[in-house]
């Protein structure tokens, strides 16, 4: 009789292990790695973000019943309503809702009337304590898209080596010590279909248009074609630099 009971008890024990709560845990910071990987192939940045977006990062705290996300323009906070069959519903205070669940090592955001299905991976690059939501995605993107060493093939400082850091610092590019890539929002609207970045030195800077083609990065002066009382509209002007990835 004892032997007969042993197998059912073992099956129950193994079944409990297979449904480990940790495998369903959605707490933590999750980033849109699919969009980053697409951009890292060396094409237009916003084209990749639009194809695999719109959301870039989720930050979930199941213990506090809180969830928030960013699409690079808006930071939206919601309330977790609880888990049902492995899925968590996020209520954005009556305006809309999202459904999140674990899919292996990824976080899956179910498709809705307003957004497509998306998948997110746990953030791996550390960010400073208290960093705003989106910082994890931004650092991972900067590392994948702008990382490594670049040579100035044409422009001021020709022959010099340029390095763009994940934290927004840049070295070797004349007249700049920090940079920021435009991901969405007003800065994107100002440059139409063109990608743009912000370059600054000692806290003062300007917008620039850029074009990424494989291992080449062209940076152009941004020419504002709008009237003084209108939102700026930037088009590519004189090419300032041609960078080639080493």
Across the structure, where does each feature detected by a protein language model lie?
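Positively charged n-region of N-terminal signal peptides that target proteins for export
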Residues: 1-4
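Bacterial N-terminal signal peptides
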Residues: 6-15
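N-terminal helix-cap/turn-to-beta initiation motif at the start of protein domains
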Residues: 17-31, 129-151
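Contiguous, well-ordered beta-strand patches that form the walls/edges
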Residues: 36-44, 50-106, 154-160, 170-245
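Short, structured interface segments
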Residues: 107-139
